[in-house]
């Protein structure tokens, strides 16, 4: 999701905030905004999100709406709500954002206050999505006229539908030569049971029908917020970001009551107390209004120092009125589901890099972090992420922000170990995996996490995709032909461990880029998994160990030893590379000792001296091998882990 150096403010912090204080608006302009908000009753509020697959035009449509309502100038902004560099480069949304708009509807002669809450679409950030939807009365279901319904659209539709949002189907990119509007309408009707006549056709790029049809539909079809101004104040914490000047900034939806600058509030989940230092709306940047009331979506600066204290889904309430304020339902702590080891490529850089990693974790409350030490790679960290995309985004941010070079181990997922005595243990590092003796005597079952994967693809690639899913231990649960044009929706139960092994890249490859994917966690299931280790002269290289299904270990083990052999230079002694699982060696490669001619300077007839030198060389090689100090360059680990 991103490409501009100027927009770097919401997700991390060693940069200058893009979600900045709105210095550009003079005090009179801010007073005018405050007065305009005061004059709009809650029944004229409209809060909505946009549900869309990647590249279906969500950011462009957001820009167009902001232009048409006068929030930004025409043509001067691109992807205003995608504030992270990674968001612009990848075309994804990572953090929830909001922007307030004023719209004068000439049909009614009234002003309306509209809050657009931009949400992440990827499953890794589903926590932000569900909290964003909870702030809204409706959503635009955006579908690309040239691509039709895609997996992410389907997954987010069901989430929005389950939260009782009023859905408005919108077909975008109708100006394209290859747009198939009729097909898109058929898919929307067949997949989501939304009538064709409710569909609005637009071009976000040109603005066609956005002002004429879409804005009036938002006013007419999306219901206003249902909160009560007279009840005790409570707000839903939708998202947060860190600002190097003011600390944590909270994105909130005011469910009931009113909150003002200077008010003292408390958190339902942490019990911590804060004083509101600044409060206002995003227009599109931070615009202080001094007050937020029922139904509004805006920001507060509570003087919070650590992002870890900003818990998505938390309830904020007035200090001293906690007993009479009902906590909002649905709060869940985010659970890391993908773990990697991270080590500096240069061990001497650990201290400096440690500061960088901790700074980024400060800005992303959903990353778990703990120090760990590898016998091969030295000091490093074990990082936990919401999913594989989250891990990828974090790594990219670290490299973009600091130019830091890390050795990142292969991603692993958590495994649940169930013991005969009834207790359970969740492991996140292959080093913690029980050995063969423990598994035989104490372990009742080992479980791995599963997901329900939703894929949409052209029918011609169905065979390839089914073969890929079967190869990755998938179990087909549903197949639906979306329409007569050949689009198919597949549902598979897949092990999460297979998904993080670049399943999406393989899916794109076998479908020539036409397949789309989304998934949802469905819990743990019993599995026959084992730990595969790489040994160098009998010593395990801990950083390279992986947990995988027993059916894969021989194939992967053979590939490992062949690949790692390419990156180890010949030593003065023989180097044996082995793959081991269940205490058995399943593959082996040998690097012959580098021969040194110790006889070069001897006279040809000096036979006894020759024998003595050869015996001495043999003893020396035996000693080196027994010590096992094989010299392995860090580049070898990096190259091997890029497999």
Swiss-Prot record:
Which amino acid positions bind GTP, per UniProt? Answer: 52-59, 118-122, 172-175
Q: Which InterPro entries match?
A: EF-4, EFG_III/V, EFG_V-like, EFTu-like_2, G_TR_CS, LepA_C_sf, LepA_CTD, LepA_IV
Q: What class of enzyme is it?
A: hydrolase
Per UniProt, subcellular location reads as:
Mitochondrion inner membrane
Recorded superkingdom: Eukaryota
Question: Mind telling me which PROSITE patterns this protein's record contains?
Answer: G_TR_1, G_TR_2
Catalytic reactions of this protein: GTP + H2O = GDP + phosphate + H(+)
Going by the UniProt record, its keywords in alphabetical order are: GTP-binding, Hydrolase, Membrane, Mitochondrion, Mitochondrion inner membrane, Nucleotide-binding, Protein biosynthesis, Transit peptide
| Enzyme Commission number, as recorded | 3.6.5.-
- Extent of the transit peptide: 1-18
**Chief place where the protein resides:** mitochondrion
What is the membrane topology here? Answer: Peripheral membrane protein
Kindly give the Pfam families that the UniProt entry links to this protein: EFG_C (PF00679), GTP_EFTU (PF00009), GTP_EFTU_D2 (PF03144), LepA_C (PF06421)
Gene Ontology biological process: positive regulation of translation; translation
**Listed GO cellular component terms?**
mitochondrial inner membrane; mitochondrial matrix
List each copy of the tr-type G domain by range: 43-226
**Reported function:** Promotes mitochondrial protein synthesis. May act as a fidelity factor of the translation reaction, by catalyzing a one-codon backward translocation of tRNAs on improperly translocated ribosomes. Binds to mitochondrial ribosomes in a GTP-dependent manner.
Listed name of the protein: Translation factor GUF1, mitochondrial
